[in-house]
């Protein structure tokens, strides 16, 4: 989302600060989230160990800021190992995440804090690092933003899933169909 002039930039900045822009992300997380939907309401601060990392639970330093993420489960891929070396894992859960606050690494930090790190996330997964075949980056996609225009109308801008992420989901779907 880019502004073409200063007036538009100021308008967008004000909407973001007032939390009036709805952001939607798709994330594939490690393990099974049992609830169909939920809210993660955990403050986030800079990690005392790793300055690039933001943590919701544990040793934090600096300013601790409010952070809220709502989510909805879209699909479950239970017990599907991404490779023979990772057999016995709990599988993955595809979620739609809606950050209500705009903290750096908020979604990654929040899902890691509840024991369901984003797939392929080397910074936040720790010992739970799992990655479905075919992708080499975290499975987190900015899917849409929705906002009110100065005219009062609403607009929703959507971004297609990148080919590597779409292929990884397709592979998980095929494996799921075989299991059923």
Language-model-detected regions and their locations in the chain:
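RNA pseudouridine synthases
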Residues: 2-180
